[in-house]
């Protein structure tokens, strides 16, 4: 049995039932929940993120939910720092950290660490975002391909956040993101060094998803249409009315929010907005599956199974996660 304290990762694509299973686990285990979701960090973004209700959050508090205003940004490095601090507090209290969500980059940051990249530069970022707005994202991708073909091959031409960040790193430091990562690998940092990727926990990794992809697609469509019925458009209208938010911000680029925002801008009809939101959510799920297929040892659970809780508990017991 490992001398390291236990932790549980509960991963899966959007609309797979992660939250429901997490709550079931929290009812029977001495654990505390930590959200691993880049959209749930934002206050006032509740319907479109499928955020647990206020009653649920009161009964089962989630760390790293509602910690930021939508005008703020939040990086994987910041998440990793916050999550590690929360995990340490939970462990010190004699409980088990249960990390649940679908932002796979955040899980990766915890497991493997992040390259030591230069800090963001607001002026450089503003210039790059202005260039993208005036000439299109393809111009940014072409520029990145010239200086850092490895990153350009990895980053989709329609991914503004990662394109801007990769170019920002180069403009600020004179080194490409690929060069920074290569330097980190060559340094072979010790196990206690920042970013070394050694998580000081015995981690059990659970993943929940429907066994059949078309089932997930149907769930995504039902959920998105239900969100619209529950007031998703009005939620985005309230965000727009503030006057300090725009489509270039990470919060508003979140899946669903972008499509509703564009609808309110007059770029689509209501039904087109719904269809685009469903398609964007399915594309997100596909990307999440891509991450998960390349992940390490993961115990898979079928969303439609009626015995996921005992299956999960049996797996955790087999790893000596449960005493």
UniProtKB/Swiss-Prot annotation:
Its keywords, alphabetically, are: ATP-binding, Magnesium, Nucleotide-binding, Transferase, tRNA processing
Q: Which reaction does it catalyse?
A: adenosine(37) in tRNA + dimethylallyl diphosphate = N(6)-dimethylallyladenosine(37) in tRNA + diphosphate
Q: Could you name the domain of life of the organism this protein comes from?
A: Bacteria
Which residue ranges does the record annotate as region Interaction with substrate tRNA? 37-40, 161-165
State the EC number(s): 2.5.1.75
- Extract the GO molecular function terms from the UniProt entry: ATP binding; tRNA dimethylallyltransferase activity
The record, for InterPro entries, names: Dimethylallyltransferase (IPR039657), IPT (IPR018022), P-loop_NTPase (IPR027417)
* Record: residues binding substrate: 14-19
The residues annotated as site (Interaction with substrate tRNA) are: 103, 125
Single biological process term from Gene Ontology: tRNA modification
Q: Does this UniProt record's set of keywords contain Transmembrane?
A: no
Please describe the quaternary structure of this protein. Monomer.
Q: Which NCBIfam families match?
A: miaA (TIGR00174)
The entry's family comment says: Belongs to the IPP transferase family.
Q: Mind telling me which HAMAP family this protein's record contains?
A: IPP_trans
Its protein name is tRNA dimethylallyltransferase
Source organism: Stutzerimonas stutzeri (strain A1501)
Its gene is miaA
